[in-house]
Amino acid sequence: MNPYQNKSECEILNAPLNNINMPNRYPFANDPNAVMKNGNYKDWLNECDGITPSIFGTLGVLASIVISTINLATSPSIGDAFALVSSIGEYWPETKTSFPLSVADVNRLIREALDQNAINRATGKFNGLMDTYNTVYLKNLQDWYDTRIPANPQGDSQLREAARRSLEEIERDFRKALAGEFAEAGSQIVLLPIYAQAANIHLLILKDAMQFRTDLGLIRPVGVPITTSAEDPFESEFLLRIKKYTDHCISYYDDGLAKIRSRGSDGETWWEFNKFRREMTLTVLDLVALYPTHNIKLYPIPTQTELSRVVYTDPVGCFGNRKSDIFSRLNFDYLENRLTRPREPFNYLNSVQLFASTVSNSNNGEVLRGNLNKIMFEGGWTASRSGDGVTTGTPFSTMDWSYGWGYPRKHYAEITSRSQALPGLNNSIHVIVGIDSFRAIGPGGQGDHTFSLPGGDMYDCGKVQINPLEDYRNSDHWISDMMTINQSVQLASNPTQTFAFSALSLGWHHSSAGNRNVYVYDKITQIPATKTVREHPMIKGPGFTGGDLADLSSNSDILQYDLRSDYDDRLTEDVPFRIRIRCASIGVSTISVDNWGSSSPQVTVASTAASLDTLKYESFQYVSIPGNYYFDSAPRIRLLRQPGRLLVDRIEIIPVNFFPLSEQENKSVDSLFIN
């Protein structure tokens, strides 16, 4: 039995190793349980046909679907929604799906024997369902919808019947596949990218059913028994499925992390752990975090949402043909602590200073040895952060993004790295990461510095490109962190030799997370709780919230947020908003909201979790704050807690009775606050 079963990522990181039945980590040549026999690690990697190296692996197509899903949540019209939903399906060409690549990527990290028949069944089923979804279901729904008029909301009867029938059939088929081919026993981890995408589509179909149930004459999902307590059987099915799908994705994501973590405590294990964490965040967890926005009972009008999590790419620069030797000698915890940041409020890079120094016997070649980051938080306060590298002396380059106030701060970099063996050092081999060129650009300007290592035998480290400059405006990520480490380790193959190197790690925010808390006059605005204006304790999120959580405990009982309108002259003090909090509570608590001294009544928050280790999807509840709020030109809200412990996911600002909304939409907004 896997001792990491049902453990969170934090527990897995801190857990003791499981050395029972652990296969050899390298080169897997003699282990009877290894995926490949009589070969080395590089050969085994090459078995995953079609995998090409990139900064985010081969999962860029799937990450693009997250953008479409976010855009769908913010879509103000049904017509736009049809176009966006249709575009999601277009990411899967008829002749080749991206899923075999992602399956191979996942399997390359967890190192389990692939059941190719299960993979073929799942990918074939998904491609078939997506074809039906796009060419039959969406077409029938659009054709019927276009015939509806206020006097006849049911539209053309024949088109209505075709739309009803195709909705019932595609909903049933996705539901069955998610319980069957997409979750086949023994392949759940490698199938997670397929499962998460299929679950996203199924929830969108249930959203359509909830929205058009009366006009289409829908009764209940096909094959689902009627329950007398369910006013809307499709809403009941939606709530059941969102919990089931979220729990499935998080459970098998944690299992995948556990399988990698149990291999050992060396750097190779960390490298693969971080890669699995990053790429599953991009293709699974990001989507899971967006599932709740499909609930039209909670989000009846367009919703602006943000993903505040950070992903860390592989350290820039390979380490020649000794990469495996180096990382087998490094410690997992050392790399985790120095190549990723501890939990803190949301922030962004303001400037970066790069430090270089000359290495002896290197013909005066410069190497990157450290960096110093100046970061800015939502409230305008700044802090300096450095990695494990050298940050003394005069920096050779400074990239400053401290332009303007309130503008999106997006940083784009193009980095080329290489390494070199330095001759002439007794009992020592040095491979130092050098930067051929470093460029960073933002709307406020760009920094550029180029320097090279001296001549000599060069190990092939390839080229790492991050958001090419010509495409930066369409980027879905921006640099939020930069960390450098310097280490010297003894070679496993020859303990008398020392191996020295430096490496650069980059952290990335999703572009949906802006640097200010901007509320929108005609949408529900979701503000991540980590975007507080004050330094405040944060804890690791459970995986399905799109970021970390703000911890309101006995030692820190106030969260403060400065707000800004997206378009000031459209708003007056007469426009009302309401506030809703999504949070989990350990013990019964109360919460109130203060807006420049005007406090709301206290609201009791029921206990939903016994401890941090027991947080589940159902642990999070929506707490509606009574009364309307009228924001002036510089609104500020504070969350105040009484005894108990609140873990806050996000704050939601909901417009009330704003003129672009239809009468029905205004009624839907009002219903959000009726207990």
UniProtKB/Swiss-Prot annotation:
Q: Which Gene3D superfamilies match?
A: Galactose-binding domain-like, Pesticidal crystal protein, central domain, Pesticidal crystal protein, N-terminal domain
* Keyword annotations of the record: Sporulation, Toxin, Virulence
InterPro entries given in the database record: Galactose-bd-like_sf, Pest_crys, Pest_crys_dom-III, Pest_crys_dom_I, Pest_crys_N_sf, Pest_cryst_cen_dom_sf, Pest_cryst_dom_II
Q: Which cysteines are cross-linked by disulfides?
A: none
PANTHER family reported for this sequence: ENDOTOXIN_N DOMAIN-CONTAINING PROTEIN-RELATED (PTHR37003), PESTICIDAL CRYSTAL PROTEIN N-TERMINAL DOMAIN-CONTAINING PROTEIN (PTHR37003:SF2)
Tell me the function of this protein. Promotes colloidosmotic lysis by binding to the midgut epithelial cells of insects.
Give the family per the record: Belongs to the delta endotoxin family.
The molecule here is called Pesticidal crystal protein Cry25Aa
- Organism listed in the record: Bacillus thuringiensis subsp. jegathesan
